[in-house]
From Swiss-Prot:
Gene Ontology BP term (one): organ growth
Binding partners and assembly: Interacts with KPNA2, which escorts protein to the nucleus via interaction with nuclear localization signal. Interacts with E3 SUMO-protein ligase PIAS1, PIAS2 and PIAS4.
Domain comment as written in the entry: C2H2-type zinc fingers 3 interacts with DNA-binding site G-clusterinc fingers. C2H2-type zinc fingers 6 and 7 interact with DNA-binding site core sequence.
Zinc fingers, C2H2-type class: 34-56, 62-86, 92-114, 121-143, 150-172, 185-207, 213-236
Name the UniProt record assigns to this protein: Zinc finger protein PLAG1
Protein family membership: Belongs to the krueppel C2H2-type zinc-finger protein family.
GO MF entries: DNA-binding transcription activator activity, RNA polymerase II-specific; DNA-binding transcription factor activity, RNA polymerase II-specific; RNA polymerase II cis-regulatory region sequence-specific DNA binding; zinc ion binding
Tissues where this protein is expressed: Expressed in heart, spleen, lung, kidney, brain, testis and epididymis but not in salivary glands.
Bias (Low complexity) ranges: 369-379
Subcellular location: Nucleus
């Protein structure tokens, strides 16, 4: 049997070309058409056959160029891997003990020490430990070769040199002896065997072709997560360094540390129908009437106009004020230029106040004016806590009228109380649809006079005064106001009442 020499390999290279490039999906493994003439091994490329031939001849053409290093290797890849050990920088780090390594395979071998299921092999002669059976047997072969024994400890076969013995030990890598783990799990599609079922499932992507791991930098897909990690470290190392060195952006103050307890209280209530909300008592709640649009459904003649609790979006819902701030009393102010209440809350509740005020300004600006030649004076109504007897309830609020000075005689055509009657519950006549655009309602003199006289008795608290904060009774209006009403004109705007 002839020995393979470099000259023979050049002839083989010319006659048969090895397949180049990566294997496409669905293609079978390339056939090993290059057998070794000294052993029964075969290879799929001339380069691999050449590297293997060095194990028979003992030649190591790739020598280390570092000073005071005499090591040589059979392939250029192994030389490059060895050169990393001379570099002062260790790029491979253990995530468990922070230990650094020059080579990735050294780190991989070190990780076995952190695996409780892995068994270590300790040499009895020198005390050195190994994590793999192959490494341990190679170490024993070195001790045996030093003493002159070149016998394999597995099959008891004798070899002529230490290098040949070490090459032979690779054939025993999958065999078990003395409690060493065995590859019991075989792939259903090929002959490969694995230690665990997890390794088999990870290997199955080779046959299924699934690539579920996407690179976020180049959109390349991989079948295994470790392959994606290896690709990102190799091809996108600069991008990863930028991500690690970039400072953490400070979040917007409006999105940081913002707790919204009202939202949690409203979620179970918003899912209820409006009829259930009106009939269901809620403890420790505040009833407000915030109108968002003039096109609200009105009841038929003879029915009572109820004051319902609405939000700016038209949803009927009680607001739990204890959740917002339980230790402060609220003061309500209602300017005549608006149809809704604005909430005056302490500093911690300013965001809620700003939202309601901005909504009211939009509503006021969008409403058309019925009389443009008249002017409105600034008058305010306040909701202040009553200081009466304890029977009235500690949390009740009453609607008190501030001091009003009437400088001019009241002119009936210039008066408009439609805004007032839009948010005060009255037992009045049916709603006039022709006055929807101007937010107004028409009443005769008798009806308006009787309605105004009934104001202190019609307004009632919607909830239990012991647990809720309701709207108090209205003070009686001025006699000059009630005596000047006319039956032939539509009631003017409310904010123009007191000129």
């Amino acid at each position: 049997m002839a020995t393979v020499i470099p000259g023979d390999l050049s002839e083989v290279r010319d006659t048969q070309k090895a397949p180049s490039g990566k294997r496409k999906r669905g293609e079978s493994k390339p056939r090993k058409n290059f057998p070794c003439q000294l052993c029964d091994k075969a290879f799929n490329s001339v380069e691999k056959l050449k590297v293997h031939s060095f194990s028979h001849t003992g030649e190591r053409p790739y020598k280390c160029t570092h000073q005071d290093c005499t090591k040589a290797f059979v392939s250029k890849y192994k030389l490059q891997r060895h050169m990393a050990t001379h570099s002062p920088e260790k790029t491979h780090k253990c995530n468990y003990c922070e230990k650094m390594f020059h080579r990735k395979d050294h780190l991989k071998n070190h990780l076995h020490t952190h695996d409780p299921n892995k068994e270590t092999f300790k040499c009895e002669e020198c005390g050195k430990s190994y994590n793999t059976k192959l490494g341990f047997k190679r170490h024993l072969a070195l001790h045996a070769a030093t003493s002159g024994d070149l016998t394999c400890k597995v099959c008891l076969q004798t070899f002529e040199s230490t290098g040949v013995l070490l090459e032979h030990l690779k054939s025993h890598a999958g065999k078990s002896s003395g409690g060493v783990k065995e590859k019991k799990h075989q792939c259903e599609h090929c002959e490969r065997r694995f230690y665990t079922r997890k390794d088999v499932r990870r290997h199955m992507v080779v046959h299924t072709g699934r690539k579920d791991f996407l690179c976020q930098y180049c959109a390349q897909r991989f079948g295994r997560k470790d392959h994606l990690t290896r690709h990102m470290k190799k091809s996108h190392n600069q991008e990863l360094l930028k991500v690690k060195t970039e400072p953490v952006d400070f979040l917007d103050p409006f999105t940081c540390n913002m707790s919204v307890p009202i939202k949690d209280e409203l979620l179970p209530v918003m899912s209820l129908p409006s009829s259930e909300l009106l009939s269901k008592p809620f403890t420790n709640t505040l009833q407000l009437n915030l109108y968002n649009t003039p096109f609200q459904s009105m009841q038929s003649s003879g029915s009572t106009h109820q004051m319902i609790t609405t939000l700016p979006l038209g949803m009927t819902c009680p607001i739990d004020m204890d959740t917002v701030h339980p230790s402060h009393h609220l003061a309500f102010k209602c300017p005549f230029s608006s149809t809704s209440y604005a909430i005056s809350i302490p500093e911690k509740e300013q965001p809620l106040k700003g939202e309601i005020e901005s909504y009211l300004m939009e509503l006021q600006g969008g409403a058309p004016s019925s009389s443009q030649d008249s002017q409105a004076s600034s008058s305010k109504l306040g909701l202040e806590p009553q200081s009466g007897s304890p029977d009235d309830g500690a949390g009740d609020l009453s609607l008190s009228k501030s001091s009003i000075s009437i400088s001019d005689p009241l002119n009936t055509p210039a008066l408009d109380f439609s805004q007032l009657f839009n948010f005060i519950p009255l037992n009045g006549p049916p709603y006039n649809p022709l006055s929807v655009g101007s937010l107004g309602m028409s009443y005769s003199q008798d009806e308006a006079h009787s309605s105004v006289s009934q104001l202190p008795t019609q307004t009632q608290d919607l909830q239990d005064p012991a647990n809720t904060v309701g709207l108090g009774s209205l003070h009686s209006l001025s006699a000059a106001f009630t005596s000047s009403l006319s039956s032939s004109t539509t009631l003017p705007r409310f904010h123009q009442a007191f000129q």
